[in-house]
Curated annotation (Swiss-Prot):
Belongs to the PetN family. It holds the Pfam family PetN. The 4 large subunits of the cytochrome b6-f complex are cytochrome b6, subunit IV (17 kDa polypeptide, PetD), cytochrome f and the Rieske protein, while the 4 small subunits are PetG, PetL, PetM and PetN. The complex functions as a dimer. It comes from the Bacteria. This is Cytochrome b6-f complex subunit 8. Component of the cytochrome b6-f complex, which mediates electron transfer between photosystem II (PSII) and photosystem I (PSI), cyclic electron flow around PSI, and state transitions. One of its GO terms (biological process) is photosynthesis. The keyword Lipid metabolism does not apply. It is a single-pass membrane protein. It is found in: Cellular thylakoid membrane. It comes from Synechococcus sp. (strain CC9902). GO terms for molecular function: electron transporter, transferring electrons within cytochrome b6/f complex of photosystem II activity.
Amino acid sequence: MLFTVAWASLAAMFSFSIAMVVWGRNGDGTLKF
């Protein structure tokens, strides 16, 4: 159970960071940090 939760959170953070990089390179401007 604990391993599954940890793996799910790790995958979520990884995909989120990938999405941030993609959006950042897109030059959309709506999401700027």
